[in-house]
């Protein structure tokens, strides 16, 4: 039997695939309150021309509209990639109770990998953290995306060089 964290992380992975199909970094988020999905999101920064349009931001904004409150007390956010500093701040300000993420972000992770903003005792709210839920699957998806993106850029660069030399 699949556990609850894996169930919702699988939903977040499906949303990450939507992001990837739109040319976005494949990150998906599912916000659950009282065992009910309240809102979802996937990265849309490129599509919306908005650097804040991360999966977490989109899900929490949608949840605020849904529950008519900016506080997400007793809610859990499931996200395929550890939140960045901006999204970590969002989790603290929205009073999310628990964060569950898949892959660690060794460059900007703010739930323990680089910083631990969500559990910083100097802040007025701390978020409980559960990490590495389906982490290998989330990590593999992200690695494959960036590998493909680098190959595309390399091919474009080589094509441009060829045009210049002709």
Question: What do the PLM-derived regions correspond to, one by one?
Answer:
Residues 1-22, 83-86, 90-166:
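Zinc-dependent deaminase
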Residues 23-27, 73:
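Short, basic and Ser/Thr-rich N-terminal targeting/leader segments
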Residues 29, 68-69, 119-121:
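Short secondary-structure boundary/capping segments
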Residues 27-35:
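Short beta-strand scaffold segments in enzyme catalytic cores
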Residues 12, 16-19, 29, 39, ...:
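Small-residue (primarily alanine) positions within well-ordered alpha-helices
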Residues 2-5, 9, 46-62:
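Acidic helix/loop or adjacent segment enriched in Glu/Asp that either coordinates divalent metal
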Residues 38-45:
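Short beta->alpha transition motifs characteristic of CBS
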Residues 53, 57, 61-94, 98:
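Helix-adjacent hinge/juxtasegments
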């Amino acid at each position: 039997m699949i556990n609850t964290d894996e169930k919702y992380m699988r939903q977040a992975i499906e949303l990450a695939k939507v992001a990837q199909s739109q040319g976005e970094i494949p990150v998906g988020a599912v916000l659950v309150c009282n065992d009910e999905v309240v809102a979802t999101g996937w990265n849309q920064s490129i599509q919306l021309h908005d650097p804040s349009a991360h999966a977490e931001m989109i899900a929490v904004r949608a949840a605020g509209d849904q529950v008519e409150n900016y506080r997400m007390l007793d809610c859990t956010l499931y996200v395929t990639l550890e939140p960045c500093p901006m999204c970590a701040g969002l989790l603290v300000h929205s009073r999310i109770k628990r964060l569950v993420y898949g892959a660690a972000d060794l460059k900007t992770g703010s739930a323990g990998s680089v910083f631990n903003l969500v559990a910083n005792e100097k802040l007025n709210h701390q978020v409980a953290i559960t990490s590495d839920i389906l982490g290998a699957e989330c990590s593999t998806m992200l690695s494959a995306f960036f590998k493909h993106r680098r190959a595309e850029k390399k091919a474009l660069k080589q094509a441009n060089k060829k045009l210049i030399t002709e």
